[in-house]
Structures are given as structure tokens and as C-alpha cells.
Amino acid sequence: MTLQMEDESTIQKNIADKLISALKTGGFLLYAQKILPLAASTGSERPFQEILVRFKEEEENLLPPGTFFPMLQEYRLLPYLDRWVVSRLASWIQESRTRTPGWPVPVNGVNLSEDTLREPKFADFVAKHIENAKLPREVFTFELGWDTALLHAEQVKIIQARLEPLGCRFTFAGFDGSEGSFNFLKVLRPDFVKLTYGIVKDIDRGLAACEKVESINNKCHAMGIRTIAEFVESHEVLEQLRLIEVDFAQGLIIGGPQKLT
């Protein structure tokens, strides 16, 4: 092994040790990004947000997820992170309700890793926190990548059967409406799908792109599945999504991630 390889190995080991320590000592931070309902408000909707995770470095520098997620994955630590997110989020909701009576509890999109999906006791862990924190229904909307949901369809059905009776919902992200995909939706029946950025970004520029999104949206609605457009970057795209009757939108034009306080 060369000196450079030894140095890289040492650096990776140090980072892994920091991540393990952070899981034990609260070295991660929760952020939330707003998901905006596009239909006319009835006044009864609860706030909707996606929960994001940041790793707090020694000097309070915030790193984007891409820098530490691969390390967590390599060392099989993602299930521990997912559990930490559920636990911390439940505590935050409980604290907020105590501090502010009548506070509207948001619906929270929580990302799940493949490793967590295969973890048999995760559903029991979630159920315990829902019960202990006396959380209302629909607090957790667990989000899976579309490819992950397809690859682990049986595990998805198992965790749905366990958590849906407790009021948990499910979102599949990165949905593009490709051939055969709606057959899988009929089987897996998520509550939401997030439309992939590639089919949403140009809907204000041409009829074909607009018609494709509208077709996907209508098919989802026919199955009782609500739609979310991600990475919305302009008011023009946002307005087109309203006209097509996509249910929700998320992106920097609506609001960036904000630290949970």
C-alpha cells in the first residue's frame, strides 16, 4: 500500500469515526423544505415539508448530504441515521406542541434508505415513537426512490402493511411515467409520487412536455395518488403546474431548506 493510499484510508476511517460519534451525540441537524399545495386553500391543510439531514462539523460548517451519505452507506450506518431522524423528529414535534398549544403539526417527508427498508425492526421502532410521543396520524410520510421501491417491492408492501394502519404514508420519488410504471403503482399504491425533474423543468417551454406531465398527473389521480413536482425553479413552471392541477410543488422558488428550531 502506498503512502497516499494509507493517508486516504486514515482520512476515511476518521470521517467514519466522526459519523458514528455524531449519531451518538447529536452531531446531525434536521432541516425542512416546504412542499406547497397548489390547489386553492380550504384552510384545513396541514403544513407539508420534506425533512433533510446535515452533518455538523467541528467548526459549525454545514456539509451537503452528498459528502457524508456515501460514507454512511459504505459502513452500513444509514439505518442508524434513519432511526435518529425519526426519533429526533418525534421529539421536536412533542416539544413544539408543548411549547405552543394548538401548533399545527406538519406532515413530514422522511427519506428511507435501502438498508432501512430491509431492516425488519424499523416499523416497530416507528410505532413505538408514534405511541410514546402521542403523535397524530399522517405525521410521517416515508419517501423512497422509485428505483428502490421497484427493486424491493416485497419489502415495501411489508412495511406499508405495518405502518399505514398507524397513519403513516408513502411517497415514491423520481417517477417519470415510463412504460409499465403504472402497473407497479397499482401494486404498491403509494400516497404520493414525486415527478422527476427531467419531465417537469420544461413544461413552460413546449406543449409536448406539458402534455406528458398532464397525462402522468391524470393517471395518478385516477388511482388516488397525489403528485408532487420537485426542484421547481421558476414562477412560470409553478403556474403551469397549477394549470395542469399537479397537487404540490417543492423547490427553491418556494423556499429552501430551513433549520428546525
Q: What residues fall within each predicted segment?
A:
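EAL-family c-di-GMP phosphodiesterase catalytic domain
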Residues: M1-Q12, A22, Q33, E58-E59, ...
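Catalytic core of bacterial c-di-GMP phosphodiesterases, primarily the EAL and HD-GYP domains
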Residues: R46, L77-Q155, F231
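Surface-exposed amphipathic alpha-helices with a cationic face
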Residues: I93-R97, I130-E131, K157-G167, E214-H221, ...
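A short, well-structured catalytic beta-strand-centered motif of the EAL phosphodiesterase domain
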Residues: L29-P70, L89, V193
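Conserved long alpha-helical elements within nucleotide-processing catalytic cores of c-di-GMP signaling
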Residues: F69-P70, P79, A161
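Charged helix-capping and loop-helix junction motifs
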Residues: D124-K128, Q155-I158, L207-E214
